[in-house]
């Protein structure tokens, strides 16, 4: 949770030790009480729900948890900071949570299937975190925009899926096959 909290604050790939960057970018900007009450407690609660596919709500919990299953099957956790921040900030809006997690799963799938490197992934999620910070009151009626795939990304995703899936690395190939199988 500390690593993801650091990422939410810094929005960049880690360059120094976690301790150094946490002190520099997090502890210098919030009080200890704020850190615990406003960040660590809600972020930890969100992390547990995301990692264990245990989102609870009166509506859409099963759908959200199904999407979380696939997010957790990706070969990285770069998607986790925006998911933690979003869930911590919108815990009682299950409609918007479903919309967000569905879009996030599509973005994470795109990044995995098209074999984007860690720098591209971190940069892509950075812009989502920047928008989340600048628009904390976003709603389903006026949702976050940076979570959407661009036209170029959609085209690249489609071309990759239309390509030679069986020559891909096992991680990418198996993810695609299992994900397609889940729709049947």
State where each predicted segment sits.
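A cross-family structural signal marking well-folded subdomains
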Residues: 1-183
């Amino acid at each position: 949770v500390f690593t993801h909290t650091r990422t939410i604050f810094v929005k960049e790939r880690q360059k120094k030790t976690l301790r150094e960057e946490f002190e520099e970018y997090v502890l210098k900007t919030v009080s200890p009480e704020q850190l615990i009450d406003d960040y660590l407690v809600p972020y930890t609660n969100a992390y547990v729900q995301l990692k264990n596919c245990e989102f609870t709500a009166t509506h859409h919990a099963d759908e959200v948890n199904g999407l979380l299953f696939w997010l957790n099957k990706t070969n990285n956790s770069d998607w986790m900071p925006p998911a933690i921040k979003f869930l911590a900030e919108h815990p009682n809006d299950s409609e918007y949570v479903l919309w967000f997690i569905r879009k996030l799963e599509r973005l994470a799938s795109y990044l995995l299937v098209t074999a984007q490197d860690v720098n591209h992934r971190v940069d892509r999620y950075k812009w989502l975190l920047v928008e989340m910070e600048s628009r904390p009151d976003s709603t389903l009626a006026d949702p976050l925009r940076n979570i959407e795939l661009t036209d170029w990304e959609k085209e690249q995703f489609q071309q990759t899926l239309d390509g030679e899936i069986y020559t891909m690395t096992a991680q990418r190939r198996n993810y695609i096959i299992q994900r397609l199988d889940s729709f049947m």
